Structure formats: C-alpha cells, structure tokens
Amino acid sequence: MDKIINIQHYFSPCGELVLASYADKLCLCDWSDNPCAERNKLRLERYLKTSFKTETSSVLEETKRQLDEYFAGNRKAFTIPLHLVGTDFQLQVWNELLKILYGATTSYKEIAQNIGKPKAVRAVAGAIGANGISILIPCHRVIGSDKSLTGYAGGLKAKKMLLQIETQIK
C-alpha cells in the first residue's frame, strides 16, 4: 500500500496552520493564508510521489499537543520527528535554523556566515521563505541585521506574537 500524506488543520492564537505527516514524520506546518502554502503542498506531493488525505496520525496529534504547550508558554523545544523536503541548500539553511535557541534571534547575514556562505544572504532568505515547517523550524527567529522584523509566511503580526511568546518569563 502506498503511503499517503495525512493533513489536518490547527487553529493557533496567531492564525490557522496546515499540518501534514508522512511516514510517521511531520512534513508540513504552514500558515493557511501563506501565499506559498499551495506551492509547499505541491512540492511535497511531487517529491513524495503521493497525495494528501484529510486524516489524522499520531504525529499530527502529538504536533498539536506540543503546539498547544508552546502557545501556552510551556514548551521551548519540539521533539517531533521531521521529514524535510527541499534542495541541499535549503536543508542546510533549515538545519541551521534548528540551532537558534528559544527566545533568541539571529539575522539572515549570520545564517549565511554560519553555513560558510557569507555572500549568499539573499539565497538564505529565499531558503528561509521556502520553509514549510514553520514554528518547529523557527524561521520566525530570523530578523534583519538592523533588528527589524522582516517578512514571515504567517505575516509580521504572527512573527511578533511568536517572538513575544518566547520572551515571556514563565
């Protein structure tokens, strides 16, 4: 039997998220109103050579539980297994994002330097924009070199809310 991509919706305080799992791993946590959401779903279908089915899975239920804890300010790290789908460069950038600690921020320039490509700031920004696993791969922690909030798939309001959640002391 072919594996399918299970898909569910999660309603967060910052907006609606689309969650998807494949082979017992989370492969999507994207904002429903993200202009690139459909592109991210198509990339998964094409790469995994399968289709979506609106059905839950143990991974999706655990993701929802951990997101609930995160939004309540009771979770600083996620333990969900991830299935990343992207180019080698995107995977390199996303793995670097996973190193950004809860409550911390970094810049696109710092990410480029950390992966050994200091002149690839725009390419890094593009890879971050293609991240289909928001929050768990914390692209919201990337800000401008001047400390300004810059683009985010969930919108700047959601980005600000996520950063505020992470800077509250509990």
Describe each model-derived feature in a short phrase:
Residues 113:
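Alpha-helical residues within the helix-turn-helix
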Residues 80-86:
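Short amphipathic alpha-helical boundary/capping segments
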Residues 100-103:
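Short helix/strand-capping hinge loops at secondary-structure junctions
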Residues 1-76, 144-170:
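Low-complexity, small/basic-enriched stretches
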Residues 136:
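Major-groove DNA-recognition helix of helix-turn-helix-type DNA-binding domains
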Residues 86, 90-94, 121:
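Short, leucine-enriched amphipathic alpha-helices that occur as contiguous helical runs
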